[in-house]
């Protein structure tokens, strides 16, 4: 049966401003779409563009698939051949997109909270275009967070009391920041592990840091993070990084896999560094949800886009 508790938002930039009820409604809506539920009947053409200023394959492709499944018209945008390379600001690019008729922008950008000047412009009055955050620097990744919540809910049917370990390059991960905050609010017990130099005491309010081998047999969810070498330009630990040593100390190998609880799952936002965060032979193992996460991402992003369509009263939705 179709869920009637539909979320309505003018923009979708963070999970921190979502209520638990809205998160649950988005999960229900995404599951509805996954189970073959009808997409909303749009009464007018809707135009959307994907503006990815950082490399992406999964998120970009997933958003475009979601957009096409909803019946939206996708306007191509290639930063490498745009006026951004001539010094045009993101605000001015967005102003132009609105002027030519684009209704919503999906943006990934290296700057944390790039969206603030687009949704709350201090020196401008005219920009009025929907913004969906596809990742901002090391800040937030709301769509990855919500597809992760959907995947966990699909497997366990609940969040309260689940033990979830977030392991790896936590400080530089926007996925970790979004997930730890929301998992905590949903009632899960959050734990952290990985190199201590990539951990910050500011995360203590969400969970507890432990050595991986002390956690492995107790966790319901092992959430592995990619080592983000591209964000380590000023990090002295980058020069001494040893992939084999990292895998031995912080990766899921065959031995640790055998120690997992029978119903435990392994998650990873991708791309996976084989034999670093996870042994190559375990990527398609029964407990690894990597491809399930990607599959669920399309349906969660459909729910997110629909929420912005409703929030902006586009296509006859409200």
Swiss-Prot record:
Primary gene name: pyrB
Record text on subunit structure and interactions: Heterododecamer (2C3:3R2) of six catalytic PyrB chains organized as two trimers (C3), and six regulatory PyrI chains organized as three dimers (R2).
Source organism (scientific name): Lactobacillus johnsonii (strain CNCM I-12250 / La1 / NCC 533)
PANTHER family, alphabetized: ASPARTATE CARBAMOYLTRANSFERASE (PTHR45753:SF6), ORNITHINE CARBAMOYLTRANSFERASE, MITOCHONDRIAL (PTHR45753)
InterPro entries for the chain: Asp/Orn_carbamoyltranf_P-bd, Asp/Orn_carbamoylTrfase, Asp/Orn_carbamoylTrfase_sf, Asp_carbamoyltransf, Asp_carbamoyltransf_Asp/Orn-bd
Claim: Iron-sulfur is one of the keywords in the record: no
Gene Ontology process terms (BP): 'de novo' pyrimidine nucleobase biosynthetic process; 'de novo' UMP biosynthetic process; amino acid metabolic process
The keyword Kinase is annotated on this UniProt entry: no
Pathway recorded for this protein: Pyrimidine metabolism; UMP biosynthesis via de novo pathway; (S)-dihydroorotate from bicarbonate: step 2/3
Sorted UniProt keywords: Pyrimidine biosynthesis, Transferase
Binding site for carbamoyl phosphate: 58-59, 108, 141, 144, 270-271
Function: Catalyzes the condensation of carbamoyl phosphate and aspartate to form carbamoyl aspartate and inorganic phosphate, the committed step in the de novo pyrimidine nucleotide biosynthesis pathway.
Leader peptide range in chain numbering: none
HAMAP family per the UniProt record, alphabetical: Asp_carb_tr
E.C. number(s) listed in UniProt: 2.1.3.2
Family assignment from sequence similarity: Belongs to the aspartate/ornithine carbamoyltransferase superfamily. ATCase family.
Cellular component per GO, a single term: cytosol
Catalytic activity, as annotated: carbamoyl phosphate + L-aspartate = N-carbamoyl-L-aspartate + phosphate + H(+)
Gene Ontology molecular functions: amino acid binding; aspartate carbamoyltransferase activity
Name of the molecule in the record: Aspartate carbamoyltransferase catalytic subunit
Gene3D superfamilies xref list: Aspartate/ornithine carbamoyltransferase
Residues reported to bind L-aspartate: 86, 174, 226
